[in-house]
Amino acid sequence: MTRITIVTDAWHPQVNGVVRSIENTNTELARLGVDVRMVTPQSFYSIPCPTYPEIRLSVAGYRRVAAEIEKSQPSFVHIATEGPLGFMARRWCVKNRMRFSTSYHTRFPEYVAARFPVPESWLYAFVRWFHNGGNTCMVATPSLETELEARGVRNLKRWSRGIDAELFHPRPKAKLPFELPRPIFMTVGRVAVEKNLPEFLDLDLPGSKVVIGDGPARHELQEKYPDVRFTGVKTGEDLADAYAQADVFVFPSKTDTFGNTILEALASGVPVAAFPVTGPIDILGGNPAAGALDDNLRDACLAALHCSPQAALTLSRSYSWEKASRQFLDNVIHAAGKSLPLLSRSQLA
């Protein structure tokens, strides 16, 4: 059996799109007969990330990480993140002449520059070095592919995302969800500086605003915006029920590479309001009935109130984890060349 080892610095108990994407892809790959082994911070001593303690950073040395990779006996290695584990895994692959792929999930340069006085140009030089060492770099959207290409990243392949339609779907709407008056403008995700939440929370909108999620900026924002309902983290059925109560899903981030929460909202029959940037523009562009894109976020929110819940649901059905995972596997086959004799495109039929 073909064995793919995925190395990631992002893993449980983190709650984010990277973790969900890897988790759902693993499930689908297993159905395709691929044995996936994980190398995550859970196997090593880790410390809280400065300014973001919810994220744990592994401090294991190269030999310890190398031993963990070798224990998994990989046919191929996929490196999902550019953190300490990803860095060590890249070193191991180069040293052992193991072909490998990477993926660009997070705007690493922007996130670091928002917290520390490091020039983005230096950080993008690292991104180029890191990803160009592999045989394929996977990206979620056409606009991100164009952007990274312009920054000198090579061998780019598309790996889209999916949605759990059994969990996220339209549900009956309560008259006063969260005991708040409608319309409900909702956002879901990490409550952190890079998510640009004040752009949403400062808006003069009818009805109520709800923020679902947690993160390092929550306490500060909760004090600054007492009229906004902060619920904390919700998962599973609780999260799906919450999505379905929204009238408009607001996605204020300008730094995401995709936006899994956009798909979750659309699948719940909730139109989306966002800026016309990478992620939202790739999902909603050409689908004005399902949501609104505008450089003025307030205008987008008000326009989305008149969009179609059915159009939102229909758009979400063009995404599935099965389709995305087959795309991932096809990229692995391409990157591996002849080094995966037991894995062929016949498995994708």
For each of these PLM feature ranges, what is it?
Residues 177-210:
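Conserved donor-binding/catalytic core segment of Leloir-type glycosyltransferases
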Residues 254:
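Aromatic "clamp/platform" in nucleotide-sugar-dependent glycosyltransferases that forms part
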Residues 271-274:
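Short hydrophobic beta-strand element within catalytic cores of glycosyltransferases
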